[in-house]
Curated annotation (Swiss-Prot):
Positions carrying Phosphoserine: 131, 134
Disease per UniProt entry: Ciliary dyskinesia, primary, 1: A disorder characterized by abnormalities of motile cilia. Respiratory infections leading to chronic inflammation and bronchiectasis are recurrent, due to defects in the respiratory cilia; reduced fertility is often observed in male patients due to abnormalities of sperm tails. Half of the patients exhibit randomization of left-right body asymmetry and situs inversus, due to dysfunction of monocilia at the embryonic node. Primary ciliary dyskinesia associated with situs inversus is referred to as Kartagener syndrome. Kartagener syndrome: An autosomal recessive disorder characterized by the association of primary ciliary dyskinesia with situs inversus. Clinical features include recurrent respiratory infections, bronchiectasis, infertility, and lateral transposition of the viscera of the thorax and abdomen. The situs inversus is most often total, although it can be partial in some cases (isolated dextrocardia or isolated transposition of abdominal viscera).
Protein source organism: Homo sapiens
Single Gene Ontology MF annotation: cytoskeletal motor activity
The WD repeat ranges on this chain: 320-370, 375-413, 422-465, 474-526, 531-570, 574-612, 618-658
Family classification: Belongs to the dynein intermediate chain family.
Intracellular or extracellular location(s): Dynein axonemal particle; Cytoplasm, Cytoskeleton, Cilium axoneme
Listed GO biological process terms: cilium movement; determination of left/right symmetry; epithelial cilium movement involved in extracellular fluid movement; flagellated sperm motility; heart development; insulin receptor signaling pathway; outer dynein arm assembly
Lineage: Eukaryota, Metazoa, Chordata, Craniata, Vertebrata
Tissue spec. comment: Expressed in respiratory ciliated cells (at protein level).
Protein name: Dynein axonemal intermediate chain 1
Pfam families named among the record's database cross-references: WD40 (PF00400)
Alphabetical UniProt keywords: Cell projection, Ciliopathy, Cilium, Cilium biogenesis/degradation, Cytoplasm, Cytoskeleton, Disease variant, Dynein, Kartagener syndrome, Microtubule, Motor protein, Phosphoprotein, Primary ciliary dyskinesia, Repeat, WD repeat
SUPFAM superfamilies (alphabetical): WD40 repeat-like
Amino acid sequence: MIPASAKAPHKQPHKQSISIGRGTRKRDEDSGTEVGEGTDEWAQSKATVRPPDQLELTDAELKEEFTRILTANNPHAPQNIVRYSFKEGTYKPIGFVNQLAVHYTQVGNLIPKDSDEGRRQHYRDELVAGSQESVKVISETGNLEEDEEPKELETEPGSQTDVPAAGAAEKVTEEELMTPKQPKERKLTNQFNFSERASQTYNNPVRDRECQTEPPPRTNFSATANQWEIYDAYVEELEKQEKTKEKEKAKTPVAKKSGKMAMRKLTSMESQTDDLIKLSQAAKIMERMVNQNTYDDIAQDFKYYDDAADEYRDQVGTLLPLWKFQNDKAKRLSVTALCWNPKYRDLFAVGYGSYDFMKQSRGMLLLYSLKNPSFPEYMFSSNSGVMCLDIHVDHPYLVAVGHYDGNVAIYNLKKPHSQPSFCSSAKSGKHSDPVWQVKWQKDDMDQNLNFFSVSSDGRIVSWTLVKRKLVHIDVIKLKVEGSTTEVPEGLQLHPVGCGTAFDFHKEIDYMFLVGTEEGKIYKCSKSYSSQFLDTYDAHNMSVDTVSWNPYHTKVFMSCSSDWTVKIWDHTIKTPMFIYDLNSAVGDVAWAPYSSTVFAAVTTDGKAHIFDLAINKYEAICNQPVAAKKNRLTHVQFNLIHPIIIVGDDRGHIISLKLSPNLRKMPKEKKGQEVQKGPAVEIAKLDKLLNLVREVKIKT
């Protein structure tokens, strides 16, 4: 703390006090006159002269103390420095500025003791000091010898024999004294503990070698595509073909055969197709890379995104739209079938056709991959609409297809051509009505491939691939029970039931279910073709889908155009659960990860997700996933990833990700391990069904 007078110079300027006595004395001395005595001079008063504009402060203000605070900021440091950022492409201000201010610098000549240079200088000083000490010792020994010489002369004659030995000893001592002692060189330790060593590996000498291959010849080609140039090219090609034909005729028959074989192997068409195949493979890889960059945000959502809002709502979930698949060639066709590949989890097959019998045209079979949503991996076209399909479990490259005209076919994805490898015909027993569903089954006893089909003609047919031919066997013929018509001749005709859907039991190999257009569901057996095991009065309209539960062996599900979805126990003829979705149901599918979760799609464009373990009465997700005028036709769960694919009647396929609430797993309890597996899923569904079974049995 310092006084205000010294602290605030701007408030009180320097005072100029002039002593009148001293001034008069000085002037009197100069003039040589005397004014008074010395005692009178000191007693005289002194007046202070102030400038007229000086600030006058009170005593309290003068005694006020001010505190000065020293800061490390440099007042002269610039505050507006900017630098160019190449990352953002703009000038960015620099927030941190060096505050160092140098007031005084002086170059010194002091060297630190611990530095290398300081150690070397100290070593040189020790050498100089040692040499000086040795010189002093030599001079002192010389003086001593001079003093001892008289004593040596006074020695007795009898001691003459010891003179040579003494002289030799004196010479040794003189040599030792003359050679200065070299102090031991101390190893200078590096304060950074750094050691530099050369590499012990052998460096190969650099050699210049010329390239032994000749560069391919280069030619510059330029032309314009005109009508006459194209015509000339065709004429030249025709002449070449005629010349080759003439040469073949001139050859002998043996040479002709060998020439034909060689030409067959090396024809221009085959070489061109090989080049096109290689080019198509490279183009497919490039297309996938471009699509992965284009749809990177969707791929990130597919892999990592989960709806965080599910933490705050227990019984409600959402569907996140991901990729959308469509093709220009299938614009006006409906999605009639969906099926995931059992081996390649990102690949799924789509069947295109039409459900309107007045607008029947061509059909298509496309296989899409999640890695390339812009274009299908495989594309096959047919003259009739594709109504159903199924992919073999053990041979994922074989696709069984059912057509609207009643034919069934097998497509081999390994073969490049677009025609089916095997196809039925009128001679081989094709259906007379549309084929609504096909299912691969286990191979027969001779290890022949086998699949089943159901059609509106009432026949359930087993197709076996024997010697590259499709051989059919009618397993069962559907008949409407209790309804017969009499003809004038007195004969009775039994109406044929129209099969629309079927599904085989997962464990009981011979048992399967069949849904019909009349709304009935028949439990059938492969061993009995004349009668049904059981009949269920399921729906009031056509049964669109029948599906066994993947975990529980007694439970199956059905849906219909009468707006309902029903869950059944095949030992009870009445449904366990009935759900009214207020619109025609196109398809239902069980979830592969839970026995209580299933999905349904309706013609009003909505997807419904149910979880019986959370809510037995209504869906936990009702979400529109298509445009208002689009009707949803099919839905399928992925076997591993938490996504579903949905198809509509405009040829669009939409992939949707399930939120965490739609795929809840059992919660972990303290001190207990989470139980997983089919047994847990069966017990979970049994717990729900037991409550309903008791009521059904009582009634």
